[in-house]
């Protein structure tokens, strides 16, 4: 069956997101042992990732559990979002842009409350693809089989008609179990080359000539 849609992860794929050491710096500043910050915030991080709590709830939990005043809270949250958002993988984003209208395009992201607004402001993802499925809005996260079904339903395609690109092995494995054609992202040239091979083998091809494209990523 011909490929009709291509879906991309965000962090580590459409965004270049190296570890900036934010957690470690704040642990040192607050006198916490290694891993202590995430231990205190674990349930808030988990709730924020599937939308069971609001962004305001997260801020309140940070204030109370880390003992931050308003100025410290503002700096801490800004640090977290700077690391979360990273920088644009411009080469891949341009490739995604040119897949339309020949293919339906989507984003499937394990996210956090507030991510849609911040990523739209930074990168305009809502204008880049046809559909975005965020874990914090859908109440489930990769590799839950239901979230792969959801993105296919939103794009009005079957899983066998869909290519999915992610940098996490478990998310790639989950997509394959769900019947999607999944690619483990390593860099732009590799990922685009594998996408192009799948599109060509399905009898269509993108016609973009990006088989050896490079760029961020």
Feature map (PLM): residue ranges:
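Generic structural signal for small/hydrophobic residues in well-ordered secondary structure
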Residues: 9-12, 51, 99, 107, ...
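Catalytic-core regions built around general acid/base machinery
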Residues: 91-102
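Proline-centered loop/turn at the N-terminus of a beta-strand
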Residues: 104-106, 181
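N-terminal helical cap/lid subdomain that shapes the substrate entry/recognition surface
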Residues: 2-93, 112
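Asp-based, Mg2+/Mn2+-dependent phosphohydrolase catalytic module
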Residues: 1-4, 8, 112-217
